[in-house]
Regions:
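Eukaryotic RNA-binding helical-repeat scaffolds
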Residues: 1-121
Length: 121
């Protein structure tokens, strides 16, 4: 029953679009599907597109880290999103990230096989 429910939620979210979701909603949704190990590629594509479209300045550091972690955990390629997260994190300064957020973010990029220049400079 749970996989069917997760499929139905993902389908409905994609159908509606995610413009009403705030940054935490986007982050938590990606995190939930990754944590559940439930593949929802259309939903993850839609979350990535919406986050990149609106920009990440309203995401807090935990939202950024959780989103990166979710895509790494899900094994879902979203290069534009991961590049945008890296740019936003560096622009803010990584000193504002909690240690757990830093480690989750580093893990996500390593798992995704991405080494964005913004994080390496």
């Amino acid at each position: 029953a749970a996989p069917a429910l997760l499929d139905a939620i993902a389908k409905e979210a994609v159908r509606r679009g995610l413009r009403e979701f705030n940054p935490q909603d986007l982050s938590n949704t990606a995190w939930a599907y990754a944590t559940a190990g439930h593949a929802a590629p259309a939903l993850l594509d839609t979350i990535a597109e919406e986050a990149v479209r609106r920009g990440l300045r309203d995401f807090n550091e935990q939202n950024l880290a959780n989103t990166a972690w979710a895509y790494g955990t899900a094994g879902h390629a979203a290069p534009a999103l991961l590049d945008a997260i890296a740019e936003e994190a560096v622009q803010r300064g990584l000193r504002d990230f909690a240690p757990q957020a830093l480690s989750n973010t580093a893990w996500a990029y390593a798992t995704a096989g991405r080494a964005p220049p913004a994080l390496l400079d």
